[in-house]
């Protein structure tokens, strides 16, 4: 992703209308199947009770490290807000272990637009570890670095053999969402995919839905 794309996503995401997106998704689910009708009903209730007054885009707190992950939908570009400091706290609390990667395996996860290649202007900040998300729903299963872009880039450029990375897949990173709207959007898209494709991915109950987890 080049820099002007990042700037475009940031600007375009401000125009996104979450309530319109929820309405369109639930209508499509209702038209698909009885399961879709039940799932859409749950989401309409969630929107009415919890989400209709949510502020979007979310206000990122001063002094707290967060990350914006942008997703492109037919309704526009949505900003998922991730709490990097919170993710680090969870890693420590749960005793989660990193995975060892060769930098060549994960260099594609780095956003070129987030890399400052002028070594004199790089401000070192290693208070949080290198983290990568890999989500079928958010990124088509392509890994995406949410913290530590420069460390991966430098390790790759210096031909280092290994780097420690905290690697999170679908559902594992739900606690990282900074706001309820980001969490709801993620769960909504999981349900939408299952309804439209007549699947039950990541669900134990064939009659359940991710709306129940919200």
Predicted regions and their residues:
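Short alpha-helix boundary/capping and kink motifs at helix termini
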Residues: 2-144, 156
């Amino acid at each position: 992703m080049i820099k002007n794309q990042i700037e475009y996503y940031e600007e375009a995401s401000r125009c996104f209308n979450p309530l319109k997106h929820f309405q369109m998704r639930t209508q499509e689910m209702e038209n698909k199947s009885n399961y879709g009708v039940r799932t859409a009903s749950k989401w309409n209730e969630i929107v009415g009770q919890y989400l209709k007054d949510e502020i979007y885009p979310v206000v990122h707190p001063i002094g707290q490290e967060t990350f914006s992950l942008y997703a492109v939908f037919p309704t526009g570009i949505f900003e998922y807000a991730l709490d990097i400091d919170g993710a680090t706290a969870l890693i420590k609390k749960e005793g989660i272990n990193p995975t060892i990667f060769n930098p060549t395996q994960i260099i594609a996860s780095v956003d070129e637009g987030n890399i400052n290649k002028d070594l004199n202007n790089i401000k070192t900040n290693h208070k949080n570890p290198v983290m990568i998300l890999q989500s079928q729903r958010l990124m088509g299963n392509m890994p995406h670095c949410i913290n530590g872009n420069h460390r991966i880039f430098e390790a790759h450029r210096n031909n280092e053999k290994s780097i420690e990375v905290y690697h999170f897949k679908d559902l594992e990173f739900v606690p990282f969402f900074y706001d309820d709207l980001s969490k709801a959007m993620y769960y909504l898209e999981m349900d939408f995919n299952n309804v439209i494709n007549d699947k039950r991915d990541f669900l134990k109950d064939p009659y359940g839905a991710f709306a129940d987890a919200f």
